[in-house]
Amino acid sequence: MKGTNASITSNKNKGVWHSMKKNYAAYLFLLPKLTLFIVFIAIPVVWAFILSFQEYQIIGGNEWAGLSNYLSVFESEAFKKALLNTTIYTAVTVPFNVITALIAASLIHSLGRFAQGFFRAAFYLPTVASMVIIAMVWRWMYNYEFGLFNYVIGWFGFEPLNWLGQSNTALWAIIIMQMLIPFGVGIILYLASMSSISESLYEAATIDGANALQKWVKITVPMLKPSTVYLVLLSTIGSFQVFTQIILMTGGGPGYATETIVHLIYKTGFRDFEFGLAAAQSVVLFFIILVISILQYRALRHDE
Amino acid sequence: MRKFSIKKTLIVSLLLLFSIVSLLPLYWVFSTSLQLSSYQDDDLERTTSYVNANPPKMYPMGIPEYFEHWGKAREAEKNDDLEQATYHRDMMSYIVEDTFSGFKRLFSQNSMGMWFFNSLYIGIVVTVGVLLFDSMAGYVLAKKRFPGRNIIFWLIISTMMIPSQVTLVPMFIMVRDLGLMDTHWALILPDLSMVFGVFLMRQFMYSIPDELIEAAKIDGASEWRTYWSIVLPLAKPGLAALGIFTFMNVWNSFLWPIIVLNSANLYTLPVGLKTLQDANLADFKLLMSGAAIAAIPMIIVFLIFQRHFVKGLTLGGVKE
């Protein structure tokens, strides 16, 4: 950056030493964070990879297990089901939430200052509450006998269902809940990006006779693309880590109907204490997220 | 003009409908927490629970019942019917007591107060630490040139992509071997090492003019003094945003705390709420009272610092 790094790297060792000594204060400033980072992030990350190739015994040493943990991960029915459930959950909720956030933000943007502030708060407020709270209240709302949800869908002629207790509805109950939680971050980011789109673009389109919808499709949506890419990546990553709702609302059940990857990691590691296997599962999760992020980034960035 | 206002009405009503859906669960937390849980009719024959009611009661029934008894008590007093008046007065105080009984049981039969305090102090300790350490690191990474700067920065940033679940197992072993299991250190230390703030602070510090820092140096200020009295005050908006997000993350953090905490008096609020639910699966008045207590502080923080939330989100997001 700005050529300074190039000159540092091209210097001889002596120059580096001199520069390090001269800048000792910079290293002192970095010391607390760097120490914490190394101990509680860098080492555990490397260790997780090592553990995934080991058979971990609580007493006694660790034995190398080669790829056997990974083989058990991919052979296990539970993991396959967890991967499938997590994928369905992500594939439905992420596009839905990003698109509704875009529409909501576009509608809000057309309003005056006061109304903008009100709706922005109304949509962001539920997201500051912990998922623990949201999951607890939705478990109550999905109650078969007294739940609000069955009551409300009754207005539209639907029969009451034991949403969380049946294996054919439990995953959908979790999905519907996620769809009805507003994507507050998305709405706020979209609103911020919309206000930076130049007015002259819209003026030019108006002169060309474009209507509101055409302007939205041809100007607003393409101009918001960087935000869309970011939001899709952000919510996909978050979605693949879904856990709190699962442990508080279904415990992964009935059967494996709502098992997700992180809930399975939790069970494997901290209920069954199979550390090697849990580490392998989490490494697999990491690569899944990495690959999906790269693919999404490329796909969404393709035409630019 | 007319067409315009119809369009606007449509937009506003659509958004209002959407916000009702979005706010309904939070409303339901508060409504259930204050719902009458057992209520006797005037003939004393039937005890009703308005919590478990089908169809559900849409607001705390104590409110209309209270005023009904109040009216009847007034009437009885007017007619000098002392027995009736006392009965209705007693019912009024019973209704108040029952309405808030969920909260009372949380504090008397469970350690809600302790959980609240634990969450609060851990949140504050972590937030202060993160603000200090991350702004120090962000400052030198943005403004100083020294060997290894880029390597350190990219090393830190590259781990932001790694899902935190990857480190669960090694961290568990480490915390156990360090003897920190079932202590608050097991929460505080890992939370202090989160790297997002370094990235945010570095972005923010870039916008501080170099001239100011140079001027302080020429005036003979030490590195620490320059950071403390020139850089930090200029970074206040960034610090506010980072502080709020750190506090919110710690306050809501769940997966790691349920793994490392075992003693009820050490629980944070989310962990306490989970054990509360495990022990009282169908007592929704109690559960919603707990949820309400956990939700209130974040709602207040949000309403006061709304501006900083927006700022933090847009800072952390796309800046292209």
Q: What residue spans do the PLM features occupy?
A:
Chain A
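Short, Lys/Arg-rich, polar N-terminal cytosolic tail immediately upstream
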Residues: 1-21
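A structural signal for multi-pass alpha-helical bundles of membrane permease subunits
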Residues: 22-304
